[in-house]
Amino acid sequence: MHSKILILDFGSQVTQLIARRVRDSGVFSEVYPYDVSDEFVRNYGAAGVILSGGPNSVIEGDESPRVPQAVFELGVPVLGICYGMQAMAEQLGGKVENGTVREFGYAEVRAHGHTALLKDISDFTTPEGHGMLKVWMSHGDKVNEMPPGFKLMASTPNCPIAGMADEARHMYAFQFHPEVTHTLQGKAIIARFVHDICGCKSDWNMPDYIAEAVEKIRQQVGNDEVILGLSGGVDSSVAAALIHRAIGDQLTCVFVDHGLLRLDEGKMVMEMFADHLGVNVIRIDAVDQFMGHLAGVTDPEAKRKIIGREFVEVFQVEAGKRKNAKWLAQGTIYPDVIESAGKGKKGHTIKSHHNVGGLPETLNLQLLEPLRELFKDEVRQLGVALGLPHDMVYRHPFPGPGLGVRILGEVKKDFADLLRRADAIFIEELRNTPYVLAAGASESTDNGIPHRNWYDATSQAFAVFLPVKSVGVMGDGRTYEYVVALRAVQTQDFMTAHWAHLPYELLGKVSNRIINEVRGINRVVYDISGKPPATIEWE
């Protein structure tokens, strides 16, 4: 039986990063809403509990989310983060106040007290000998009086109690966020908590996960048939392979050609799954259906909802032809859930995803989401472990709504045709351009394989169609044609990202090819926005 960490979600948009950091340490973890019952907490069997951050204030009194009392009575270690620290302090007899100075962003925290959690962990030492941590803060309220039994563990000039510890009861708390990559020692802090404080072993790995997931799918589905929407993207492909391993021919994949796919996507999907993997795949031409419903629609949320709705309708029609079809499988992963406010709807919605939004209550199929608790890098690891080809597993993410969210404003077939050709040129040149590491830089990969080219070196790259025309010159005449934006980002977890510094020569070649080969486009621009403040997709 694996050791496991229970994470209670108070609504932070980065809660699942806590789970990722715990899993990076080889320890299994799960996220549940904060309002689970005391009985659930007692019966869960956690080796430790982590309380996430959140958008609320404990000063709101009875309206504020509270930690289940059983958490503090279990006798297992507890780590509170941001709101989790404030809730811990308030419920155990401390005091919380509105801060006069809100802290959002980088901060330098001084470690105090030589606690077991922070011992010998620091980024630098001051001339006075104080250990300092470079961290990420995001809070308004702060603890101004610690509960009985707690001692100071960390501080900043604006937040005198930035960390506290009751080592007798193994309770620790930080006002900063160790789960985000901006906190340089965050991974070490969480590893220290789960290994040294909670006593967990590194016994969670992908082969074990496959065995457990396969058994769970079999128990969940029984003898029913499952229908899965196969897009050719990483998530749906890995979900299909995992479910097929579990139930074989009980799985039918439905590949919907809605006119918003990448160039030659349909051919690739059919060859890979139907011909090579032996999966039952039904291809449906629904271009007219989707384009008809999207006509005249410009609002991004409305487009996503329409695309999600039409997917579901297609699946329902197909399910009606299969008497034993009871389940609709989707490749939903953690970032989808996070950005749609996820479990319990405790967070603030950023935008809805077709996988987790737009499903009508009249849906006659139950949802099967075997990847729902996995991050993108874990999905890729799973795909490799399942024997899928490397180039498929490490293909860039493609949104469920397809090019529908890469065409700004109204979606038209002509726009999609232009965009898919421009996008194919961009991806081809990224693959054809060798990646050269900048002098003095260190390479970081998510699969341990050195980057072969700029496609490997970027986490996601694509073209975006802008429904505006610009003046240009072609030969001896003036043109008035459309604009395409190129987007390429690098990220570890898709929660935050920075724009990729592609070589000018590469960008120039891509621009020249698109303008010369895709009639109807006369201008190419490059997006240099990070996430945040922008999202990776434009819509």
From Swiss-Prot:
Annotated ATP binding sites: 231-237
Domain Glutamine amidotransferase type-1, chain residue ranges per copy: 4-203
Q: Name one Pfam family in it.
A: NAD_synthase
Q: Which reaction does it catalyse?
A: XMP + L-glutamine + ATP + H2O = GMP + L-glutamate + AMP + diphosphate + 2 H(+)
Signal sequence, start to end? none
Which branch of life, at top level? Answer: Bacteria
Identify the enzyme class. Answer: ligase
Provide one Gene Ontology cellular component. Answer: cytosol
Q: Give the matching SUPFAM superfamilies.
A: Adenine nucleotide alpha hydrolases-like (SSF52402), Class I glutamine amidotransferase-like (SSF52317), GMP synthetase C-terminal dimerisation domain (SSF54810)
Its biological purpose is as follows: Catalyzes the synthesis of GMP from XMP.
This one is known as GMP synthase [glutamine-hydrolyzing]
Native organism is Herminiimonas arsenicoxydans
What's the gene? Answer: guaA
